[in-house]
């Protein structure tokens, strides 16, 4: 998490939304400095310790199409991004999350690298219930959301919201290797597309993302929305109190 007392803003780092690059840029050129820990939540981590005047600061964060995140996850494991998967280490923060993420990384490495899973095999195995991130907790109440798909234009708009002029575009950092196509092209078969509609449909609708028009022959099943609501009850409890 990044805070600037000079410009009165807080940047909440949602994972896999270019948050590292944005945070680095805010620290370099917009008087930001680190507070709490990287992926701290605004409502449960920041507000508990914030001073009254800090609670009035503008709040910005990021967002990214989860279909893109899924493809990126696959290639990060396949290329052993930053040796994160061949030599997994515990995260520094989180009550349960650090153990869950280490288990997840080990499992994906064995399946993708050692067993040679394709993207579709990985997607079918690893994604079984409708997707959500902890953006569902508080992003709707934030002052501006920077979309990964429109990164530099949205970053410029976010800076306007907090009242500062843009110095430059965000330098590319932490880029995933080996991706050679638009992310939705990796969902090649109708089987993968149906799975994607079930897994991502409710989240995409919530955040005004669209599936490709060429997928219109496949509908998001009604029970996906029911499962999304049910699973999110447990997710919110985990993210707020157990992670």
List where the protein language model places each region.
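Membrane-interface amphipathic segments in extracytoplasmic regions
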Residues: 1-243
């Amino acid at each position: 998490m990044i805070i600037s007392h000079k410009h009165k803003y807080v940047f909440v780092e949602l994972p896999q939304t270019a948050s590292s690059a944005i945070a680095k840029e805010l620290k370099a050129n917009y008087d930001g400095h680190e507070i709490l820990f990287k992926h701290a939540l605004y409502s449960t981590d920041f507000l508990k310790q914030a001073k009254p005047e800090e609670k009035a600061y503008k709040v910005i964060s990021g967002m990214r199409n989860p279909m893109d995140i899924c493809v990126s996850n696959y290639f990060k494991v396949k290329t052993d991004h930053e040796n994160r998967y061949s030599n997994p280490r515990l995260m520094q923060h989180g009550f349960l999350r650090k153990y869950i993420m280490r288990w997840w990384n080990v499992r994906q490495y064995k399946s993708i690298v050692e067993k040679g899973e394709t993207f579709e095999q990985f997607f079918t195995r690893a994604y079984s219930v409708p997707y959500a991130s902890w953006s569902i907790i508080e992003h709707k109440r934030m002052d501006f959301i920077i979309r990964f798909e429109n990164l530099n234009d949205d970053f410029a708009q976010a800076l306007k919201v907090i009242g500062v002029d843009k110095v430059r575009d965000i330098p590319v950092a932490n880029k995933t290797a080996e991706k050679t196509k638009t992310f939705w092209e990796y969902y090649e078969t109708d089987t993968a597309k149906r799975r994607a509609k079930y897994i991502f449909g409710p989240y995409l609708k919530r955040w005004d993302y669209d599936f490709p028009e060429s997928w219109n022959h496949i509908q998001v099943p009604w029970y996906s929305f029911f499962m999304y609501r049910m699973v999110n009850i447990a997710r919110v409890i985990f993210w707020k109190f157990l992670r």
